[in-house]
């Protein structure tokens, strides 16, 4: 009976992970949410009744330690798979060129992105590592982004979401550092994976956001002419899970791969 912990599990891709994993009654599935009283957290209680949930902000090490003890009680001591999904994408810089950001916004968005998407991931891994060591699968996965691939960014001028993208690139290296430090010697898989291009339900975009999305879609089609539409979140989760289940420390330790298990991002 494998156990999974998904951070950022109250909505979006994190909720899709919980929904898919909990469809197998043999799985022990736990969602980590920042605030159970948030309106975004209601799906955990209202729809996925076989999902456990614990509360912690991933930038708060003390709260994460408390959550780890709660997870230990749920699983009986170990944890098979940790999926670091919680992340922040600052809306002010999502489709604004770097040179058009004010110095204050530039600094704020980079620091916020790195605090959550890099430091928060490190705090989360450290808090749950003792449980991973006692698990069977021993896998620590960080959800990254195709925007974090330098060659793709350079070759196809993907200039959007700069703070988010650089924080995800740093998170990729963080996984490689964990692998270098203890992954190979302890048999723990540390890996970053891009979910691909995924459609996400949201509010109607502004005119500027809509234009930014159109420009990005055109660049992605130049990279992958076969690309016709984003995947649904459910499609992305299924493909990611297949890659994760087949990944090994020997072949994928410290790697950054796509939802296809390679460097083909779409």
Swiss-Prot record:
InterPro entries: NAD(P)-bd_dom_sf, Sc_DH/Rdtase_CS, SDR_enzymes, SDR_fam
Keyword NADP: yes
Domain of life: Eukaryota
Enzyme Commission number(s) of this protein: 1.1.1.-
UniProt keyword NADP, yes or no: yes
Example of a GO MF term: oxidoreductase activity, acting on the CH-OH group of donors, NAD or NADP as acceptor
Practical applications according to UniProt: Secalonic acids show unprecedented anticancer activities against various human cancer cells and might be interesting for further derivatization, targeting diseases such as cancer.
Record-linked SUPFAM superfamilies: NAD(P)-binding Rossmann-fold domains
Keywords: NADP, Oxidoreductase
Active site: 145, 164, 168
Group of enzyme by EC: oxidoreductase
Binding site for NADP(+): 13, 57, 85, 164, 168, 198
Pathway note: Secondary metabolite biosynthesis
Family from the record: Belongs to the short-chain dehydrogenases/reductases (SDR) family.
Function: Short-chain dehydrogenase/reductase; part of the gene cluster that mediates the biosynthesis of the tetrahydroxanthone dimer secalonic acid D. The pathway begins with the synthesis of atrochrysone thioester by the polyketide synthase AacuL. The atrochrysone carboxyl ACP thioesterase AacuM then breaks the thioester bond and releases the atrochrysone carboxylic acid from AacuL. Atrochrysone carboxylic acid is decarboxylated by the decarboxylase AacuI, and oxidized by the anthrone oxygenase AacuG to yield emodin. Emodin is then reduced to emodin hydroquinone by a yet unidentified oxidoreductase.
Protein name (Swiss-Prot/TrEMBL): Short-chain dehydrogenase/reductase AacuF
């Amino acid at each position: 009976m494998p156990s999974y912990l998904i951070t950022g599990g109250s909505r979006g891709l994190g909720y899709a992970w919980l929904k898919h994993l909990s469809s197998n009654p043999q799985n022990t599935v736990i969602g980590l949410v920042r605030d159970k009283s948030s309106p975004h957290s209601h799906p955990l209680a209202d729809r996925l009744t076989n999902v456990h949930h614990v509360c912690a902000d991933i930038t708060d090490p003390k709260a994460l330690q408390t959550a780890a003890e709660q997870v230990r009680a749920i699983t009986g001591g170990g944890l098979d798979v940790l999926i670091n999904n919680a992340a922040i994408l600052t809306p002010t810089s999502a489709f604004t060129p770097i040179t058009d950001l004010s110095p204050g916004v530039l600094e704020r968005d980079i620091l916020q992105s790195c605090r959550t998407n890099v430091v928060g991931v490190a705090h989360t891994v450290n808090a749950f590592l003792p449980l991973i060591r006692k698990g069977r699968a021993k896998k620590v996965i960080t959800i990254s982004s195709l925007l974090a691939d330098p060659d793709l960014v350079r070759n196809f001028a993907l200039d959007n979401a700069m703070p988010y993208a650089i924080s995800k690139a740093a998170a990729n290296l963080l996984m490689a550092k964990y692998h270098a430090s203890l992954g190979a010697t302890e048999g723990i898989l540390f890996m970053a994976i891009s979910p691909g291009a995924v459609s996400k339900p949201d509010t109607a975009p502004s005119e500027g956001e809509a234009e930014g999305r159109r420009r990005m879609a055109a660049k992605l089609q130049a990279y992958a002419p076969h690309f016709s539409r984003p995947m649904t979140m459910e499609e992305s989760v299924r493909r990611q899970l297949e890659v994760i289940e087949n990944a090994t420390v020997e072949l994928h330790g410290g790697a950054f791969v796509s939802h296809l298990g390679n460097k083909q991002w779409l």
